[in-house]
């Protein structure tokens, strides 16, 4: 994705988890936070998949507290769920059914990320 961006930007990473195997734990765990000062800046959250929406909602609340100028969401995949909140400024690659998928960066217990395509895990 970064190879396609033609503007000067700063990139930072965070790590959030909420799954054990194929099931969500219901808890959002922030394993690594960003180190950049994002106050007054335009932020783009890049996500592999939006499933229940709990993780993205957690991140939106977190970043809104940091007084970002704007927050946009880019996701490769979004499951067809109804969320308890409104997603705005979202850019979604593909909307998919309620199935557990792996490959192309998506994992199951830290496996299958390196698959070159996306597959349904049965």
Located regions from the model:
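PRPP-associated nucleotide enzymes
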Residues: 1-122
